[in-house]
Amino acid sequence: MNEASERPNHFIRHIIEEDLAQGKHSFIRTRFPPEPNGYLHIGHAKSICLNFGLAQDYQGECHLRFDDTNPEKEEQEYIESIKRDVQWLGFAWSGAVRYSSDYFESLYGYAIELIQKELAYVDELNAEQMREYRGTLTAPGKNSPFRDRTVEDNIELFKKMRAGGFAEGAACLRAKIDMASPFMIMRDPVLYRIKFAEHHQLGDQWCIYPMYDFTHCISDALEGITHSLCTLEFQDNRRLYDWVLENISIDCHPRQYEFSRLNLEHTLMSKRKLHLLVKEKKVTGWDDPRMPTLSGLKRRGYTPASIREFCHRIGVTKQDNQVEMSALEACIREDLNQNAPRALAVLDPVQLIIDNRSDEKEWLTVPNHPNNPGMGHRQMPFNRVLYIDRADFREEANKKYKRLVLGKEVRLRHAYVVKAKYVEKNAQGMITAIHCEYDPETLNKDPSDGRKIRGVIHWVSADDAVPAEIRLYHHLLTASHADTCLFLEAFNPESLFIRQGFVEPSLANTQEGKTYQFEREGYFCTDKDSSEKHLVFNRTVSLRGESALYDL
């Protein structure tokens, strides 16, 4: 796969180029501001590629800033995983890692300024009363009875909030805007709430925490962000973003621009829902290869280049749409087709015994990649007793079946032509061995008498094959549109199949994360659960869809 050499052309790029041309900005600075309440998923990759990519393209900067204003749900583990994921995707943030909590003292000062300008007040309505007073989309809200407190009272009460003088939920700081606004976000939104929780960076220094909409815009301004990019669900929040910056004493006024989020079929794009899958033990963890997290995709065998290419292809628009999983799979197939060495593996083994061959071992020289001589060659042992895949043999079959059938011939990949003679079965009628004869004159060449050999199957030497656990993955959810289903009920119980098979001996010393094409089976990655005595491989993606095996 060749990563796109041309810059993607989209509306945000047009905005930046116009800003630069008109002299509005001489330098571009973006930011990626995740909340550290879970592991990043493929949806975040779109934002990472956009923000860091724009900074790279325009010789600017991109900050990594953790929006750490909700201490009850945030953990240092998530911070470390997010940093690893950004670096794994191939990006580097400018300067030190930043935290919204770095600005808590400044944010507090701006809150005091809003109180002094009679643009904020301490409210003591409880949550239920506040919902009642807010009104609906068709009915205006009504003012809180605490809305008209004096500046002095509000400052005193706000300081009392900071000092821990109120219980959680007993008071909050609200902006004083317009309870009759047609935009719910502008009906006196909460700016600060009380939380007695240990903060992963600051410990117990604070018991009041700023809300996202208050923190986000000021943090952008303090960092000199020129283009604040977020997804469409924050479109209405832009009104509050601008209102805050227009009403405090701060010179920098970044602009917020929204783009469509990534919606991918048969999976989840919500850290909250993914967290629940982990909690309910539907999956083994955040890096389960079925998960759409970047750590899960990495473990499954996806490469940074394939994910960057995927983000390039889906583009940046304001139109919400559902992206088919096949679009992501196409990117990793192209990447691994070019870069993954080939190997032979049998997922559902049955013995193939060559009756007219001695027990002497033969070593075959096999290319590691059919189209890339630079990847070199390997030696593969060929013996009298082999394993082939059970699906590659039938006692009877129609003419469309191009694999091994009793009385007919097939080629063994990289080796000889064989003809099936008879089978052995156990008491239950299952085939335990297939007996055949081989043509010793057909090593990597056609029969001399002109016989046409229609099919090719793969194999491994029974004496030398290495046992391996093969994990085959399918969609995480049975429903294609996750937002319209009860996702726990839609969890696919058949999202994982485990096969006990064999791989060729050259893979005995494989390393975690190493990817291969198992010929005729798909692309596979060595899992972290592998050990010297127990190899484990994850299927990254099939060759050309689930029926690929039957096309060969």
From Swiss-Prot:
Compartments, as annotated in UniProt: Cytoplasm
Keywords: Aminoacyl-tRNA synthetase, ATP-binding, Cytoplasm, Ligase, Nucleotide-binding, Protein biosynthesis
Catalytic activity: tRNA(Gln) + L-glutamine + ATP = L-glutaminyl-tRNA(Gln) + AMP + diphosphate
Motif ('HIGH' region): 34-44
Residues the record lists as binding L-glutamine: 67, 212
MF-aspect GO terms: ATP binding; glutamine-tRNA ligase activity
The protein's enzyme class: ligase
Motif mapping: 'KMSKS' region: 268-272
Gene Ontology CC annotation, any one: cytosol
Signal peptide (from-to): none
Superkingdom per UniProt: Bacteria
This protein's record includes keyword Transmembrane helix: no
Transmembrane segments: none
UniProt keyword annotation of Glycoprotein present: no
Classification via InterPro entries: aa-tRNA-synth_I_CS, Gln-tRNA-synth, Gln/Glu-tRNA_Ligase, Gln_tRNA_ligase_bac, Glu/Gln-tRNA-synth, Glu/Gln-tRNA-synth_Ib_cat-dom, Glu/Gln-tRNA-synth_Ib_codon-bd, Glu_tRNA_lig_a-bdl
GO biological process: glutaminyl-tRNA aminoacylation; glutamyl-tRNA aminoacylation
EC number(s) per entry: 6.1.1.18
Record-listed ATP binding positions: 35-37, 41-47, 231, 261-262, 269-271
Subunit structure: Monomer.
Alphabetical list of PANTHER family matching this protein: GLUTAMATE--TRNA LIGASE, GLUTAMINE-TRNA LIGASE
NCBIfam families: glnS, PRK14703.1
HAMAP family reported for this sequence: Gln_tRNA_synth
Family of this protein: Belongs to the class-I aminoacyl-tRNA synthetase family.
Protein name: Glutamine--tRNA ligase
